[in-house]
């Protein structure tokens, strides 16, 4: 049975029965065709003559037109257009941070909105693989040889995106035992070098986190109070477990408490953090990590709600970039198996090596969940810091700056 309430019944509307008066009273026809008077029109504004004529099939040029090459080209052009939009949003966010505009909390919503927009675009790009996968491996094989030596690795915009977000150069997987920039020449190589020298989103967020209110030792001193509370809590739990009769469960609980003690001992050891930072296992400075954890614990306070959303959106970007890499790996494996890539790389093997935490920029934010503790262990806010976090102010020099930005 159809879900349409009109199925099986005759419902005809006789437009010829409309009177001239009814037709004249049709408000849907009261508009004005401004285009008839000349000026900018849709196709000109979007320069569709350029966009829609930019699909040049190499197979057709060689006299062997392959239908699915058109899909391959359009899909990758769409990726590049979206990469351009991501870079547009990312550059604007970096500019807001660089100019100190985040000190004015009114601009934080702008930052979060644009970062969230980036994550939504990345989500779309992850899903876009499903369109490309409607092409079979044999369909791709039919025109693959026409592409060489072109390769997705040569996407300048994707490499710029990685650099501007903050993928560490030293953690990149070598491309055929060479520096990734060696695959780019002239102006493109210079653009990549310039992007490596600019302040990254990671570095700018790090500096912002270091200014988190409440970290000052002469003030609320969140870090010192948290350390004292955690080790006091662990000691109390240890004494409670020790009173229990000997059993396998007791031994397991004692072992777990020892692990927790070592875990938090490492967290509060600044020298250990610096060591992990030098090895690339941590990305944020010690002070920035303190700020991130404080925002995490007090995220319900009005002043920390938007910063917490920002940290969440930054993790979303990392997650979606990882998903994009993974989907890319799966698609390449499906299309070419273990063959070499068109650009000369090992193909699937190389791409698989990039799906790791080496390419995660905000990995420290993911690891914050490691340090969750019972709520009553979190230092209680004193009246001064509670009042400070309860009200967001414009132009507050202690945390967030007075100039507006675009």
From Swiss-Prot:
Molecular-function GO term, any one: metal ion binding
Catalysis: reaction(s): L-tryptophan + O2 = N-formyl-L-kynurenine
GO BP term, pick one: L-tryptophan catabolic process to kynurenine
Database matches in InterPro entries: Trp/Indoleamine_2_3_dOase-like, Trp_2_3_dOase
Secreted as UniProt keyword: no
E.C. numbers: 1.13.11.11
Residues where heme binds: 328
Cofactor(s) annotated in UniProt: heme
Cofactor note: Binds 1 heme group per subunit.
Enzyme class: oxidoreductase
Pathway given in the UniProt record: Amino-acid degradation; L-tryptophan degradation via kynurenine pathway; L-kynurenine from L-tryptophan: step 1/2
Residues the record lists as binding substrate: 72-76, 144, 342
Keywords in alphabetical order: Dioxygenase, Heme, Iron, Metal-binding, Oxidoreductase, Tryptophan catabolism
Function: Heme-dependent dioxygenase that catalyzes the oxidative cleavage of the L-tryptophan (L-Trp) pyrrole ring and converts L-tryptophan to N-formyl-L-kynurenine. Catalyzes the oxidative cleavage of the indole moiety.
Assembly mode: Homotetramer. Dimer of dimers.
Family: Belongs to the tryptophan 2,3-dioxygenase family.
Name used for this protein in its record: Tryptophan 2,3-dioxygenase
Taxonomic source organism: Xenopus tropicalis (Western clawed frog)
